[in-house]
């Protein structure tokens, strides 16, 4: 017979049979080798065909293994020949193919030829229940009246089961999530499916709004018989385009597979509805030089009504791919899927609640569901409901489950800190200097304290974990172990029996005892001990997830934070001196926003700081960032003098399409996208081009800005501070006059520089006073304190006398330049001499660096600490 007339699958089976014979040192390939190869290939379909013919396939494999062991072996024989018995079976296979009119010989005909085989392979199949007539009927059913006319004829058989997923079957098994709401969209989809022509709906909507869920909802309705008569009993099949493309190495393979799918769909008389998720991927899929893509192959079937199809894609991709192909677009009817509102999202989450509770093994409360919908809508602006709300519920549930299964976060942090200190201890032990010895003592003390704390937590955690897991699961486990012990005893496997009897069983019984006592004590509240494990997902857990994802402090304010906000002025005054009015206005704005009273559609606060140079405008902004985020890193500083030209506006929001740098994004918009909760400092704002203020209008009013790529950036969680020197000459000339009078004069000058619509959108215009002599001394203390902190890192202490402090303040005071000359005075009169003395070795570790003013000069006299 001609081996080139075998189908690809059959050729592969013969090659595998040859390898099997060679591995086992068999000199000849026998029918049993080929049978083993066919059953060993999951893609061959031989096992499913035999099962359909009533063969007990699970009995076949052990019998084949036994038959292979009984075959003669020849050591060192490399040339494996086709055995006489196999030749005889192949001849019968060839005759059967000719009788059926097949151009190529398929592997199922080999199985049919084995039905009459007198050898091992035939005997094994007959003993497993093979009957020739049943196998012939199964082959006819699989072929569907088609002949094998190509080498891939076998591969493309049952294409629907290979390349699609049956959603109606999954719905029947209860594997699909319940679909809540979306009745209008499902009804419109059903309406389009019932049309005579162009009965192909395409669901178009933003990512995450529930397009796929609508199709799953349709599948569930079909299963529940909640659809019109024309749709009853139909199947919804999800097309797996990746499976169609995977492994299509040669030209025409992909087209052949898709053609096989379309052919099967054409034969089913419209009983199958194909769902193509990400419909735009069909345009261009499988396209090679001069070949057709999947989109073009679908058009005729769609036009004739042979293919009942539902597509789903996003708005952008529909416009980019489908709309460009007018012939494809006209064959689909659009169903726009909008983003559900917060109320609808809450209803959807309530429907999914039970599924997520089962998956995570925790309880999800109703306040958590409401919080997930509201907080995701408010704070996660770059994604869509209900997807982003479901994500919050899912992640909060996963977090609680993880705490139950593994160490609680507080213990994990302690554990890592203990390891870190142990590593440091080993490194410091090798050093012999005094500083290392002192550090070693500190490490030992801290390690002992942390270890005690960890042990206390571990004791609480173990008790709580035992209570949470409950007794039922442990009882079931004990029951299972005892059943396993009885089985092992019957088999005489006493080593494994001993492991269970003296190892696992006592451990489980101890756990059961602990769980029982923990459950009894669960009702008794122990206020002295912190609770480590949570079993409920509440609103606070959702807020924690949002806070971690966005960096925005959404979580309920703890008492410590409330006190901190109430004393905000004291914190800011530690760094900003002499600007009481400015500090009060800024503090009030932050308190309003954190108390939830500020307008949610605008930034937390927008301020215009006015005043002479060096009075603390930028320093107050830095102090504000430090107060809100415990770090000045969260301050986005933009020097507006860099935006003096008209075209420089594009640098803020990103270049428009077609310009160089389009993909890079804007300087301001990208910074806020990465840190949505931050203080934005627009320094020297009056130096910017007037067009820059047009961009800022929508930021100040609506709290959002559209960048060069059309993405909306959320500024609602930012504090915007603009600084300017405008009116500084009036502020200095009117020193000592009431604040309101100075502000009125400065306001008149502002009107000449900035447009009314810009000024009208700013929350507060804050006028900074010029600094006076008494303020400079307080600022000098702050500057010297920072110098002292730098010296402390070198184990030295700075001690400045009152006389020296007064002299520094006097020499550093300049009413025109504010506090900046003071910084230079500290640098020149203190830092420079001290730096020289340290380098000369006069001052070293554990020394006090005294600074005094004597006889018209600064004096530094060394004393031991």
Swiss-Prot record:
Residues 390-524 form a coiled coil. The keyword Nucleus does not apply. Keywords: ATP-binding, Chaperone, Coiled coil, Cytoplasm, Nucleotide-binding, Repeat, Stress response. PROSITE patterns: CLP_R, CLPAB_1, CLPAB_2. GO terms for cellular component: cytoplasm. It is found in: Cytoplasm. One of its GO terms (biological process) is cellular response to heat. The keyword NAD does not apply. Residues 771-865 are annotated as: C-terminal. InterPro entries: AAA+_ATPase (IPR003593), ATPase_AAA_core (IPR003959), Chaperonin_ClpB (IPR017730), Clp_ATPase_C (IPR019489), Clp_N_dom_sf (IPR036628), Clp_R_dom (IPR004176), ClpA/B (IPR001270), ClpA/B_CS1 (IPR018368). Residues 158-339 are annotated as: NBD1. Residues 561-770 are annotated as: NBD2. Residues 340-551 are annotated as: Linker. Residues 3-145 form the Clp R domain. CDD domains: AAA, RecA-like_ClpB_Hsp104-like. It holds the Pfam family AAA. Residues 82-145 are annotated as: Repeat 2. ATP 1 binds at residues 205-212. Belongs to the ClpA/ClpB family. Part of a stress-induced multi-chaperone system, it is involved in the recovery of the cell from heat-induced damage, in cooperation with DnaK, DnaJ and GrpE. Acts before DnaK, in the processing of protein aggregates. Protein binding stimulates the ATPase activity; ATP hydrolysis unfolds the denatured protein aggregates, which probably helps expose new hydrophobic binding sites on the surface of ClpB-bound aggregates, contributing to the solubilization and refolding of denatured protein aggregates by DnaK. Homohexamer. The oligomerization is ATP-dependent. This is Chaperone protein ClpB. The lineage of its organism: Bacteria, Pseudomonadati, Pseudomonadota, Betaproteobacteria, Burkholderiales.
């Amino acid at each position: 017979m001609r081996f080139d007339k075998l189908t690809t699958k059959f050729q592969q089976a013969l090659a595998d049979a040859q390898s099997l014979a060679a591995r086992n040192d068999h000199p000849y390939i026998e029918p049993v080798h080929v049978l083993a190869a066919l059953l060993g290939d999951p893609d061959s379909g031989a096992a499913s065909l035999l099962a359909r013919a009533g063969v007990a396939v699970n009995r076949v494999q052990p019998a084949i293994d036994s038959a292979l062991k009984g075959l003669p072996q020849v050591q060192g024989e490399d040339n494996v020949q086709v055995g006489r018995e196999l030749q005889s079976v192949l001849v019968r296979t060839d005759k059967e193919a000719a009788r059926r009119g097949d151009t190529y010989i398929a592997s199922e005909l080999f199985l049919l030829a084995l039905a009459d085989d007198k050898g091992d392979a035939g005997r094994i199949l007959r003993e497993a229940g093979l009957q020739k007539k049943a196998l012939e009927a199964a082959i006819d059913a699989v072929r569907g009246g088609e002949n094998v006319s190509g080498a891939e004829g076998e591969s493309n058989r049952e294409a629907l089961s290979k390349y699609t997923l049956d959603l109606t079957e999954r719905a029947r098994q209860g594997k699909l999530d319940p679909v809540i709401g979306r009745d209008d969209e499902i009804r419109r989809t059903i309406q389009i499916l019932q049309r005579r022509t162009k009965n192909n709906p395409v669901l178009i909507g933003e990512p995450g709004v529930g397009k796929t869920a609508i199709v799953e909802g349709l599948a569930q309705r079909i299963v529940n018989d909640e659809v019109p008569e024309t749709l009853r009993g139909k199947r919804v099949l999800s097309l797996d385009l990746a499976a169609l493309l995977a492994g299509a190495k040669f030209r025409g393979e992909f087209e052949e597979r898709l053609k096989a799918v379309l052919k099967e769909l054409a034969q089913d008389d419209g009983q199958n509805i194909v769902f193509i998720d990400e419909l735009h991927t069909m345009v261009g899929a499988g396209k090679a030089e001069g070949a057709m893509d999947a989109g073009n192959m679908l058009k005729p079937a769609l036009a004739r009504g042979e293919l009942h199809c539902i597509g789903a894609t996003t708005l952008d991709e529909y416009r980019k791919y489908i709309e460009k192909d007018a012939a494809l677009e006209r064959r689909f009817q659009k169903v726009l899927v909008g983003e559900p509102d917060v109320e609808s999202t809450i209803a959807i989450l309530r429907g999914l609640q039970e599924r997520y509770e089962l998956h995570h093994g925790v309880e999800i409360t109703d306040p958590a569901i409401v919080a997930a919908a509201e907080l995701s809508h408010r704070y996660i602006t770059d994604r869509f409901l209900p997807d982003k709300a479901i994500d919050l519920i899912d992640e909060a549930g996963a977090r609680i489950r993880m705490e139950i299964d593994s160490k609680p976060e507080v213990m994990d942090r302690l554990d890592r800190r203990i390891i870190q200190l142990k590593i440091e201890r080993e490194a410091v032990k090798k050093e012999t200097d005094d500083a290392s010895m002192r550090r070693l003592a500190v490490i030992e003390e801290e390690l002992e304290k942390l270890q005690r704390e960890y042990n206390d937590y571990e004791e609480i955690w173990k008790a709580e974990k035992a209570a949470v897991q409950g007794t039922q699961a442990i009882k079931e486990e004990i029951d299972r172990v005892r059943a396993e012990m009885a089985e092992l005893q019957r088999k005489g496997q006493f080593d494994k029996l001993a492991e269970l009897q003296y190892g696992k069983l006592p451990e489980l019984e101890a756990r059961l005892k602990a769980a029982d006592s923990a459950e009894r004590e669960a009702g008794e509240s122990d206020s002295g001990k912190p609770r480590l494990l949570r079993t409920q997902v509440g609103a606070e857990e959702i807020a924690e997830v949002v806070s971690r994802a966005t960096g925005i402090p959404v979580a309920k304010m703890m008492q410590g934070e409330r006190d901190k906000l109430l004393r905000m002025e004291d914190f800011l005054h530690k760094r900003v001196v002499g600007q009481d009015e400015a500090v009060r206005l800024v503090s009030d704005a932050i308190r309003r926003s954190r108390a939830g009273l500020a307008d949610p559609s605008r930034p937390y606060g927008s301020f215009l700081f006015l005043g002479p140079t060096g009075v603390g405008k930028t320093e107050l902004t830095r102090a504000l960032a430090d107060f809100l985020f415990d770090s000045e890193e969260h301050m986005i500083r933009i020097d507006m003098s860099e935006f003096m030209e008209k075209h420089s506006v594009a640098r803020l929001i990103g270049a428009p399409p077609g310009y160089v740098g389009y993909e890079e994004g804007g300087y301001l918009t990208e910074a806020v996208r990465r840190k949505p909760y931050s203080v934005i400092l627009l320094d020297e704002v009056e130096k910017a081009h007037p067009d820059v203020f047009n961009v800022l209008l929508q930021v100040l009013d609506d709290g959002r800005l559209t960048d060069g790529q059309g993405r909306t950036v959320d500024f609602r969680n930012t504090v915007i501070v603009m600084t300017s020197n405008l009116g500084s000459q009036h502020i200095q000339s009117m020193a000592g006059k009431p604040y309101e009078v100075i502000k009125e004069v400065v306001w008149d000058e502002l009107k000449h520089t900035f447009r009314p619509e810009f000024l009208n959108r700013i929350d507060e215009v804050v006028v900074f006073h010029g600094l006076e002599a008494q303020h400079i001394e307080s600022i000098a203390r702050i500057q010297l304190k920072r110098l002292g902190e730098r010296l402390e890192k070198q184990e030295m202490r700075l001690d400045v006398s009152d006389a020296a402090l007064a002299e520094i303040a006097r020499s550093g005071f300049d009413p025109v330049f504010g506090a900046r000359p003071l910084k230079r005075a500290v640098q020149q009169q203190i830092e420079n001499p001290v730096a020289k003395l340290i380098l000369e070795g006069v001052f070293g570790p554990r020394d006090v660096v005294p600074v005094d003013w004597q006889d018209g000069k600064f004096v530094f006299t060394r004393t031991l600490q």
